[in-house]
Amino acid sequence: MVVDRKEEKKVAVTLRLTTEENEILNRIKEKYNISKSDATGILIKKYAKEEYGAF
């Protein structure tokens, strides 16, 4: 069985967070056992989908 995966080119992004925003990401990280980077990506995709209809 061959799985065809689409290669995605990723770009590095730097975010400056307030202490409160960082704490929220820490809570998400602990609750769902995912990295802050993954949590941020998920939140960006969720917002884009809600705001623009598709991502």
UniProtKB/Swiss-Prot annotation:
GO terms for biological process: negative regulation of DNA replication; plasmid maintenance. The keyword Transcription regulation applies. GO terms for molecular function: DNA binding. The keyword Transcription regulation applies. Keywords: DNA replication inhibitor, DNA-binding, Plasmid, Plasmid copy control, Transcription, Transcription regulation. Disulfide bonds: none annotated. Belongs to the transcriptional regulatory CopG/NikR family. Acts in trans as a negative regulatory element in pE194 replication. This is Cop-6 protein. The lineage of its organism: Bacteria, Bacillati, Bacillota, Bacilli, Bacillales.
